[in-house]
Amino acid sequence: MSALLRPARWLLGAAAVPRLPLSLRLPAGGPGRLPSVVRVAAAGGRPAAGELLSQARLYAIVAEKKDLPEEPAPVRRSGSQFDWALMRLDNSVRRTGRITKGLLQKVFESTCRSGSPGSNQALLLLRSCGSLLPELSLAERTEFAHKIWDKLQQLGTVYDVSHYNALLKVYLQNEYRFSPTDFLAKMEGANIQPNRVTYQRLIAAYCSVGDIEGASKILGFMKTRDLPITEAVFSALVTGHARAGDMESAENILTVMKQAGIEPGPDTYLALLNAHAEKGDIDHVKQILEKVEKSDHYFMDRDFLQIIVSFSKAGYPQYVSEILEKITYERRSIPDAMNLILLLVTEKLEDTAFQVLLALPLARDETSSSFGSFFLRHCVTMDTPAEKLIDYCKRLRDAKVHSSSLQFTLHCALQANKTALAKAVMEALRDEGFPIRTHYFWPLLVGHQKTKNVQGIIDILKIMKEMGVDPDQETYINYVFPCFGSVQSARAALQENKCLPKSTTFAQAEVRNEAINGNLQNILSFLESNALPFSFNSLRGSLILGFRRSMNIDLWSKITELLYKDDRYCQKPPGPTEAVGYFLYNLIDSMSDSEVQAKEERLRQYFHQLREMNVKVSENIYKGICNLLDNYHVPELIKDVKVLVDREKIDSRKTSQFTSSDLESTLEKLKAEGHPVGDPLKQLILLLCSEENMQKALEVKAKYESDMVIGGYAALINLCCRHDNAEDALNLKQEFDRLDPSAVLDTAKYVALVKVLGKHGRVQDAINILKEMKEKDVVIKDAAVLSFFHILNGAALRGEIETVKQLHEAIVTLGLAKPSSNISFPLVTVHLEKDDLPAALEASIACHEKYKVLPRIHDVLCKLIEKGETDLIQKAMDFVSQEQGEMSMLYDLFFAFLQTGNYKEAKKIIETPGIRARPTRLQWFCDRCIANNQVETLEKLVELTEKLFECDRDQMYYNLLKLYKISGDWQRADAVWNKMQEENLIPRERTLRLLAGILKTSNQEVPFDVPELWFGDDRSSLSSSSPSAGDTVTEKMLLSDCRLKKSKDAYNIFLKAEKQDVVFSSEAYSTLVGLLLSKDDFTRAMHVKDFAETHIKGFTLNGAASSLLIIAQVRRDYLKVALETLKAALDLEQVPSELAVTRLIQALALQGDVKSIETIQKMVKGLDAIELSRMVFINNIALAQMKNNEIDAAIENIEHMLASENQTVEHQYFGLSYLFRKVIEEQMEPALEKLSIMSERLANQFALYKPVTDLFLQLVDSGKVDEARALLERCGAIAEQTSILSVFCLRTSQKPKKAPVLKTLLELIPELRENDRVYSCSMKSYVADKDVASAKALYEHLTAKNMKLDDLFLKRYASLLKDVGEPVPFTEPPESFGFYIKQLKEARENPS
């Protein structure tokens, strides 16, 4: 008793301490105690539910610590980083009541990277290392805390008493044994004074090991310092006496408390309950619980959970059930219970954890079928014995708590690479009839494959064999073969270990692997000796790759002959002719044009050898190969392929061609006899139009003009429009109007007129046609609106800004189309094509201000993100947020980050507090991903929206499965099934049917019952009849999908029409080809084009589609084909876009193809509609010559053009900037040196300063400042070329992030600062880049020179200063920027 009386006397001798409010009471912090709730209650009353805060709220008050007055708040530093860390940890605790090690590690590493972690950050990290980490063992938690302490101290973090107290709390929660005296000495050495909280926790530390004497010493310190003794101290003393074996003294502490004027509260009673629980004294526990129930006190669920911990850890799990009966299972206590379960599993008390798990109300919730995943995952992590874990799984399933517990446990075991456990679980699943699939073993194989662990691979293959699972080809090729020196050694090792399957799978994988490595001799030997039937389709892709990697044509031929003649490989149907034909087609199709050209002789030899081997192909496939060879610009090979055609199967049907000669003769005869010729004339005109014979049709019209009728004119107008003949089309329209002013063309012909006139720059004439459509009430349907879009889009792709604006304004103002987002797309596209992102954004914003639509904002955002235009992104987001709401802004940003692959940023956006699902927006992006075959993007969308509030997860997975169906990826589809089960998702019937269809198509077992359609019988009865109305496709459907940019749907309609032998109009196919090319879907576009060419006589792409085709061909390095496409378009009198022609010329220049550039120059000569500058040819021909190392010739040509009296380009317009820039970018140093010499010579000898000035400016722009400075010193006249320098400044100021370039230019030529245009451009660029220092320097320089500054300059400077919170040293001009821009423009245009 003496040990008890000593502290009691001190307590009685001290002044009576008023009872602390419960909100300020600290938890007892006894060993192993769960984090206690901060209790807020009226005296003696039970708190309201909303006033009870979990320890999660501690994170919300770390910065202020208002509820912890005994620990003075340290000075706050690194606010934004701290807020970020606080948010991540706080969100985790709010959501789950715990923190994972991974999350804490990330926050810790991020904090360390900040360089100077703040005091609050350190405190936050330390407090997270205790009971908030239930998934870590006690020792690991403490080790983590020490790691954080040491590292932050190294980084310069200054610790105060709050940090030492936090460390003490972690020690207590983690039951860490340490010396309190040494801890005090450590604080003293750091010159840190302990406070009341320090002493309280040191007392708790002594008491946790039953050291009452040590606790008494600390109490003595507190008494001498006149520190109040709180309930927390008494609670610790209860624990100390109990662990010292003196339960009587422990119980007497309550009496001592009352004598000290402190009424024992819940914490004290809980400490006493834990003391009895550690002794296994259930009777005393019950007595105390009854006593508390009769008093004004109460226990919360987490208090009962703590008692369960005490019983369990002391070895008395038999009493847990009696405590569980006391728990009310309030919703807010569920995270505490789950964390208790994790803690028990960590402490190897899985049985008790399982008992608590089954007692939770969620386990009895019939709507939940996957509760307990967290328990199973942690059991896997903590290496719970397989037998016990499998038993848990079965009991959870039988209790209908977790319907897929074994599958989920297998998933966790595979993730954790726990082979033995995975095997045991798979055996349990197999015994229950669950199919074990090959890809389940891939996570186990990949670890061994990375380390070349042959034995590990063999062990996994043995397990697969035991499980009755045969590896597929992917398994062997991706995971097994890479571990061996050769396939033969792999076969030998597997045979030795009896892992070689009896099926053909290994052999097929062997062939594929040898083909991939180009070992054709091994393939031939295998195919000759193979005794099993193989599918040619299973070999085709690998053989193509093998052929391309081997140049042995004899082996090519022998393998092809073997495949053609051996029944094992080309079974019927379709037979060897079709199978080998498709192989040849795919072989050539897989090559680029340059590869085909390089292998032309080898391919010719190959085809000749096949002919000698009597290998045949069908005529249809021959035509396809011809098209490929023609596109690859090697038509010479066509005759070599023709000899392979199977002549016996050629369709010998004769086709008769109806000519116009008979009609023309009849017409002349009727005219001579004086008979009416109206009808036959119209018939002849229509026939010539169908033959696309425009020249002849116009001649006939001229000859019989007096007899022409309305129908003939209409047909001729349409014909001229198709042939891009704007002049004759307009003349015919005028004659049409004179013939009958009231006559009306059909909508398609009006639209065609608008299109051809707009394309040829006759915008006003096109607008007049639009006005006539309005005046004559021409019916405008969806097809016409779609055509309007294509007209505008074609102009946009050509870069014709004014054309797009004027035509769009006319169409909308006249009411011919509503100002929808789609019809407004080209207003933005025209700027995107020019890569003018600021203008594109402004155009989109202007559309919203005028029409309340925001076209292409997604594409604009994606471009801005790719370019890193943070200011413009912020501007866009501010506008969207203001006009459409913050939620719309977040979704726009989320989708843009996803599209550009910035998944981390996308995750941050979608985890924004308060964001909820918007089904329409989500479905829009899903459809976009499906249409563009963006598998990874859609997968990330589904993954990131898992926790999104009100997100229809079934719909998300349904979209993902739709994409997998297109790609035929059954493995990923099967993984989706597992993922849906993990999420406890009940899929809709359509989702199940879609998944089942994917698995069945790939001959895989379906692991669930497939719902049957109630109308199945009706559907099957219709399947044998002709296509139903719902199956019939129309051109309107195709054009509608094209208008909506649904390229995938439009292409599917085309395929369906192809099967039904439905042929659309030329314009429909041109539209579809253009759409597919705009989506970079080159292969499908060519399929559509080839079909149209074979089904519509004289089919040609329209101008816009031809331009897109040229760009696509250039992008794929099909330069010869692109040149042919350009020639064909020009032969049809089409006007390709300036962009398409320029891209082709530039690509040819980089390849050194001077001849082709000169050919293009001749082809476009005189075509002013293309608006191609002569400098495009001059620059690119010179560049091509330099690429061919003909530098002297290139320079001589340039000098000759500049010095010649017959100048083709005036000196002031002879710009070589592009040439200089490409030479610098391509690092062509000899060429750059000689160009520099040439430029200086022209300047010094001929006073031609533009070349040297252009070179100087390109050196500045590319960052070669020293070279630019040296050039300026050698040629000082550069500084006098004010007009050239001003134009450069103007153009540069319009580009983002170019302020440093202008700054460098002004440093090199200081006198430019006083040029009003230059300093205005400089200020504009400084403001755009937020370069305050440079802006200030420029302003101060100009004011010092007493320069008169215009209002626009001052307005820009004032806006910059206000943005950064600095005072404006003058009166800010009051009007808008637009006002001053207009004012300055007028002043410069009218200098008077």
Swiss-Prot record:
One of its GO terms (biological process) is negative regulation of mitochondrial RNA catabolic process. The modification Phosphoserine is found at S1025, S1026, S1028, S1137. Pfam families: PPR (PF01535), PPR_3 (PF13812), PPR_long (PF17177). One of its GO terms (molecular function) is mRNA 3'-UTR binding. Residues 1-77 form a transit peptide. Widely expressed. Expressed in liver, brain and a subset of small diameter sensory neurons in the dorsal root ganglion (at protein level). Disulfide bonds: none annotated. PPR repeats lie at residues 125-159, 160-194, 195-229, 230-264, 265-299, 300-334, 402-436, 437-471, 677-708, 709-745, 746-783, 784-820, 821-856, 953-987, 1030-1064, 1065-1101, 1102-1136, 1137-1173, 1174-1208, 1315-1349. Keywords: Acetylation, Autophagy, DNA-binding, Membrane, Mitochondrion, mRNA transport, Nucleus, Phosphoprotein, Repeat, RNA-binding, Transcription, Transcription regulation, Transit peptide, Transport. Induction: Induced by NGF in nociceptors. May play a role in RNA metabolism in both nuclei and mitochondria. In the nucleus binds to HNRPA1-associated poly(A) mRNAs and is part of nmRNP complexes at late stages of mRNA maturation which are possibly associated with nuclear mRNA export. Positively modulates nuclear export of mRNAs containing the EIF4E sensitivity element (4ESE) by binding simultaneously to both EIF4E and the 4ESE and acting as a platform for assembly for the RNA export complex. Also binds to exportin XPO1/CRM1 to engage the nuclear pore and traffic the bound mRNAs to the cytoplasm. NCBIfam families: PPR (TIGR00756). Component of mRNP complexes associated with HNRPA1. Component of the complex, at least composed of LRPPRC, BECN1 and BCL2; the interactions prevent BECN1 from forming an autophagy-inducing complex with PIK3C3. Interacts with CECR2, HEBP2, MAP1S, UXT, PPARGC1A and FOXO1. Interacts (via N-terminus) with EIF4E; the interaction promotes association of EIF4E with 4ESE-containing mRNAs. Interacts with exportin XPO1/CRM1; interacts both alone and in complex with EIF4E and 4ESE-containing mRNAs to form an EIF4E-dependent mRNA export complex. This is Leucine-rich PPR motif-containing protein, mitochondrial. It comes from Rattus norvegicus (Rat). The gene is Lrpprc.
